Amino acid sequence: ELSCIERWAEAHRAELVVFIVLPISWWIWLFRTIKRKCSAPKASAHAERVRDVCAAVAANAASSDVSGAPLLMRTDRSVYESLSTRNSDKTQVNQVPLRALHAILGLDDDGVLHCEPGVTVGEATRFLLARKRMLECTLEMEDATLGGLAMAQGMTTHSHVCGLLHETVVEWELVLGDGRNVTVRRDNEHADLFDALPLSHGSIGLLVGIKIRTTPSKPWV
């Protein structure tokens, strides 16, 4: 049987959401946005951040537990930052420094966006709209990261027209399990990995850079 407080909360859930939950969520969003802008990584330091990831992965590959089995690895992103239904315990594993990889590295003359995997859809969209471009596959989830969407299933409500997000990727930059940093394209020596990476969820390698096609933005919706 429900308590008086539970019955009251159930009867007034609309008021609780509008006047308490939404304002709290807005303040949390504002705090996270300011914190992210203040700690924005420099694009020029991309190679240094990748070297840190390579070193962490290589060190993990060279270590083992008491039974001789390789140690587990997880990213150092907080659980609340991940779009996942599972609550992962990262206290007993080696954490790889991927959290700092959220810089936009540039937009070339062909309209290809070069960025780190932690860049969100919202950040990429604002950057591109200022240059009259947009992602070919734009998702409605502003906080979703481009790297996560490309390595998982980045689907949008108009994917029947534009396809999935990973189908707009032209280049992947990976750190493999032995700590090597490789660039994957359809026309280079790692071409066999190109179509294996989508839906792999990081099981083949850790994504540290990505190049995605964009398209001119329309003046109307």
Regions found by a protein language model. Name each.
Residues 1, 6, 10, 15, ...:
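Glutamate identity and glutamate-enriched acidic tracts
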Residues 1-36:
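Terminal signal-anchor or tail-anchor transmembrane helices
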Residues 11-20, 81-92, 132-136, 194-203:
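Phosphate-binding glycine-rich loops and adjacent basic patches that engage nucleotide phosphates
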Residues 34-38, 218-220:
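Active-site-proximal beta-alpha loop/turn segments in soluble metabolic enzymes
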Residues 36-143, 149, 153-158:
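Glycine-rich N-terminal segment of FAD-binding domains in flavoprotein oxidoreductases
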Residues 149-221:
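FAD-binding subdomain of flavoenzyme oxidoreductases
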